[in-house]
């Protein structure tokens, strides 16, 4: 793999990758350690890595321990002020620091960041605020703190919490926060580490899909259900200036490195237009 990886290492040195970290890779102890090792390696070869993490299961468990009921509407957590306190305590606390500790154990120099720090994530109420409460959307991303950390060789690990100018704190969807941060940083890649293998058509996973083909597959009913918003979001992110968007299964051992440093990859990469087939020296990822 090392020989295959060398062109990619040269290609991506100094570039920024935003990684949205979620799914089973956040729960399984072996996968958690492998993710930390992979992230550390990316940083060691000169890639600027920014992590945005989820943590919904941990929030639900903490709420239950505190005797608080958890309610979801269309998959989104109804968030009152008590729930915001739990989210701050859990997401920006234990979940965030556990990730930081694992990366630092491998020499990765990670730093825990909340979206509240240095006005990193400014938020606004969701259009469904009357139903969802303090669930917010990203209004603005301030990159100065992230840039400072990355330029110092550190790995920002960001809990997706934001606040508005009135001081209201909001729970923000981690996928949305990661996309907004990637656009603000003009990242080379946005990589979603989840429990989804990629875009499946029949019995195969599409390695690369362009905007026109994705629109056609949606229109024909081949891409359906929960994959549609993922695909739409990917192309909105590309339109915002991000180089490529990747969707990979974090349950595959070393999926992050395999996606970035091999010709075949393991998931689906989203591009605006299909490129001419690269040479071995140029690489595909």
From Swiss-Prot:
Catalysed transformations (reactions): N-acetyl-L-glutamate + ATP = N-acetyl-L-glutamyl 5-phosphate + ADP
GO cellular component: cytoplasm
Compartments it resides in: Cytoplasm
Main location class: cytoplasm
Residues the entry annotates as binding substrate: 55-56, 77, 171
Pfam families registered for this protein in UniProt: AA_kinase
CDD domains to which the protein is assigned, alphabetical: AAK_NAGK-C
Top-level taxonomic group: Bacteria
Gene3D superfamilies assigned to the protein according to its UniProt record, in alphabetical order: Acetylglutamate kinase-like
One GO MF term: acetylglutamate kinase activity
DNA damage among keywords: no
Enzyme class: transferase
Listed pathway(s): Amino-acid biosynthesis; L-arginine biosynthesis; N(2)-acetyl-L-ornithine from L-glutamate: step 2/4
Entry-linked InterPro entries: AceGlu_kinase-like_sf, AcgluKinase_fam, ArgB, Asp/Glu/Uridylate_kinase, Glu/AcGlu_kinase, NAGK-C
Protein EC: 2.7.2.8
UniProt site positions, description: Transition state stabilizer: 20, 230
Similarity comment text for this entry: Belongs to the acetylglutamate kinase family. ArgB subfamily.
Protein name per Swiss-Prot or TrEMBL: Acetylglutamate kinase
Species, as recorded: Chlorobaculum tepidum (strain ATCC 49652 / DSM 12025 / NBRC 103806 / TLS) (Chlorobium tepidum)
């Amino acid at each position: 793999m090392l020989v295959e990886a060398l062109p990619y290492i040269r290609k991506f040195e100094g570039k920024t990758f935003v990684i949205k970290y979620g799914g089973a890779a956040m729960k399984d102890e072996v996968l958690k350690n492998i993710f930390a090792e992979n992230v550390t390696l990316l940083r060691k070869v000169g890639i600027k890595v920014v992590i945005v993490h989820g943590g919904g299961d941990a929030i639900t468990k903490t709420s239950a321990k505190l005797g608080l009921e958890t309610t979801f509407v269309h998959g989104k957590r109804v968030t009152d002020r008590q729930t915001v306190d739990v989210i701050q305590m859990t997401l920006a606390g234990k979940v965030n620091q556990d990730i930081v500790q694992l990366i630092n154990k491998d020499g990765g120099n990670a730093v825990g960041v909340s979206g509240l720090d240095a006005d990193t994530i400014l938020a606004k109420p969701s259009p469904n605020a009357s139903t969802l409460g303090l669930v917010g959307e990203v209004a603005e991303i301030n990159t100065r703190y992230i840039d400072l950390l990355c330029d110092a060789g550190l790995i920002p690990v960001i809990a997706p919490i934001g606040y508005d100018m009135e001081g209201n704190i909001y729970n923000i969807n981690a996928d949305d926060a990661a996309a907004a941060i990637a656009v603000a940083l003009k990242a080379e890649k946005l990589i979603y580490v989840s429990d989804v293998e990629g875009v499946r058509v029949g019995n195969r996973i599409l390695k690369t899909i362009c905007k026109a083909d994705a629109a056609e597959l949606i229109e024909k009913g081949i891409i359906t259900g929960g994959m549609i918003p993922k695909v739409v979001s990917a192309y909105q992110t590309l339109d915002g200036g991000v180089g490529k968007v990747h969707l990979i299964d974090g349950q595959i051992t070393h999926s992050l490195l395999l996606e970035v440093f091999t010709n075949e990859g393991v998931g689906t990469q989203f591009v605006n237009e299909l490129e001419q087939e690269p040479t071995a020296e140029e690489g595909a990822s």
